[in-house]
């Protein structure tokens, strides 16, 4: 059996970049890392509470954090930033003040920028949220997978693999179902692959969704 490594960590430094860009002393490193995680959780919670979406997709692709001595720059890459801005016109400023209070940024300024992604459904996080929303609404898993693949085809990707594991459709015995369209070369380091694993809580139990998207080869 081939052991499956996380495709993002496998390609770090070649086709994949870091989401946190900062340096620190080894003794302060863990603090910085925890702070990053808290910032990400805080932003996700805020967006979850304040975004009124019909599809249940929050649309956060990734959150990049850059730190300098006097500034923390947070860049939120979103698929549908319009929804957040429409539901809360002053949402970004509110979020900024919330984060500043949370982290007591006395000597550091915190700055938040929201960037829109060109093709939201070419991003595995947004797709996973879409599938999770469908599964919560008791749509059959095959239908949800097919729909997700249709959406990625519009975002002209070269291949996609979707895997759902757990008590699918509320069956007694948990199983793993997967579907692949196009090429997904996991062993080619040159291949630019985006990956995400997402947990969804349904009334039957927890389902795990994994998505690999093959974007292009360098």
From Swiss-Prot:
Gene Ontology terms for molecular function: rRNA binding; structural constituent of ribosome
Pfam families, sorted: Ribosomal_S3_C
Xref: PROSITE patterns: KH_TYPE_2, RIBOSOMAL_S3
SUPFAM superfamilies from the UniProt entry: Prokaryotic type KH domain (KH-domain type II), Ribosomal protein S3 C-terminal domain
Highest rank taxon of the organism: Eukaryota
Localization, UniProt: Plastid, Chloroplast
NCBIfam families named in the record: rpsC_bact (TIGR01009)
Name the record gives this protein: Small ribosomal subunit protein uS3c
Lineage: Eukaryota, Viridiplantae, Streptophyta, Embryophyta, Tracheophyta
